[in-house]
């Protein structure tokens, strides 16, 4: 096998290593951004139960089925449930977090456009799961 060159294999291995390093660095960066909750974020408790959502603001104000927030302000959701497992989802803002009894899961977001956006349960939670919806209302 004299004259056989390994250069194509080494180039292939080098390209794969560079791509894996890039994907790993991007994944680490995204994880770091997701975990960094802004210091001024308002905490909103989100409680799922068959078959509606309850929202409790830091000042004690409660809303059922509708959540009113301000545009360009950060919010941290503390999500739990009173009964079976649910999954809190605001599709337009890529918010998706499980609601598990006895546990508080956190996720944050900062709405950047005003309007009304659907809130849904993304975990089958019983007979009326399809009707477990709410509305996020982002105000100027």
Label for each model-derived stretch:
Residues 39-41, 62-64, 70-74, 83-85, ...:
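Extracytoplasmic
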Residues 1-11, 67, 90-114:
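Extracytoplasmic beta-sandwich strand-turn segments characteristic of Greek-key/jelly-roll folds
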Residues 54-59, 83-101, 134:
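Histidine- and aromatic-enriched segments that form or immediately flank copper-ligand environments
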């Amino acid at each position: 096998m004299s004259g056989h060159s390994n250069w194509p294999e080494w180039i292939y291995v080098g390209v794969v290593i560079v791509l894996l390093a890039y994907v790993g660095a991007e994944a680490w960066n995204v994880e770091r951004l997701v975990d960094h909750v802004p210091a001024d974020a308002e905490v909103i408790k989100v409680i799922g139960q068959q078959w509606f959502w309850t929202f409790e603001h830091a000042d004690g104000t409660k809303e059922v089925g509708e959540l009113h927030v301000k545009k360009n302000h950060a919010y941290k959701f503390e999500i739990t449930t009173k009964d079976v497992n649910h999954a809190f989802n605001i599709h337009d803002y890529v918010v998706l977090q499980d609601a598990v009894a006895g546990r508080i899961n956190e996720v944050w977001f900062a709405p950047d456009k005003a309007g009304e956006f659907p809130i849904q349960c993304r975990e089958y939670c019983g007979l009326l799961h399809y009707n477990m919806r709410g509305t996020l209302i982002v105000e100027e």
